[in-house]
Amino acid sequence: MENRWQVMIVWQVDRMRIRTWKSLVKHRMYVSGKARGWFYRHHYESPHPRISSEVHIPLGDARLVITTYWGLHTGERDWHLGQGVSIEWRKRRYSTQVDPELADQLIHLHYFDCFSDSAIRKALLGHIVSPRCEYQAGHNKVGSLQYLALAALITPKKVKPPLPSVTKLTEDRWNKPQKTKGHRGSHTMNGH
């Protein structure tokens, strides 16, 4: 019988970013209580030797599973030291992988109070609205003009420590294009 391969999307992430994200998740689960119902699985609880941890986030009758890996093949860069993250949405026997932005939106919808477009309608009807969004990572678009005007009236409260964002965990902070200084540009780039 042949080997059967399963391909998964795994974002390469440096280990310090993974450690920070894990500590933010644990803080939100055990200290602040914002992440009620979340489940953290340690590496020694998993039968797979490459799994560093799993965070199970219930979303109604489905759940989001964020798995961190270690001991993977290194990437093209020196700092890609075999650490990675995969994000999976599961409902009963069906599962699919999702990107970090969608994961943040799903978490945002289920767990955090938000001052969103619906707040405008609620305020006009006389209902009490939440004055600010607690989880800014869940927004990936610019709001309507009404929303921006109402949001500008309310000064956002800084949350310490920040909420654990999957997008922030998987962003590529190393390969961002560098800006050149001055009008002459970089000496190495223009051949001088």
From Swiss-Prot:
Q: Where is this motif: BC-box-like motif?
A: 144-153
User: Looking at the record, which segments are called Disordered?
Assistant: 164-192
Kindly give the InterPro entries that the UniProt entry links to this protein. Vif (IPR000475)
Q: What does this protein do?
A: Counteracts the innate antiviral activity of host APOBEC3F and APOBEC3G by promoting their ubiquitination and degradation. Acts as a substrate recognition component of an E3 ubiquitin-protein ligase complex: mechanistically, Vif hijacks a host cullin-5-RING E3 ubiquitin-protein ligase complex (ECS complex) and the transcription coactivator CBFB/CBF-beta to form an active E3 ubiquitin-protein ligase complex that targets APOBEC3G and APOBEC3F for polyubiquitination, leading to their degradation by the proteasome.
Note the site residues: Cleavage in virion (by viral protease).
Answer: 150-151
Q: Residues annotated as region SOCS box-like?
A: 151-180
Q: Which organism is it from?
A: Human immunodeficiency virus type 1 group M subtype B (isolate BH5)
What is the protein name given in its UniProt record?
Answer: Virion infectivity factor
Aminoacyl-tRNA synthetase as a keyword of this entry, yes or no, is: no
Region Membrane association, as annotated, extends over 171-172
Its GO CC terms are: host cell cytoplasm; host cell plasma membrane; membrane; virion component
Task: List Phosphothreonine occurrences by residue.
Answer: 96, 155, 188
- Is Ribosomal protein among this UniProt entry's keywords? no
Region Interaction with host APOBEC3F, as annotated, extends over 14-17, 74-79
Please tell me where Zn(2+) binds in this chain.
108, 114, 133, 139
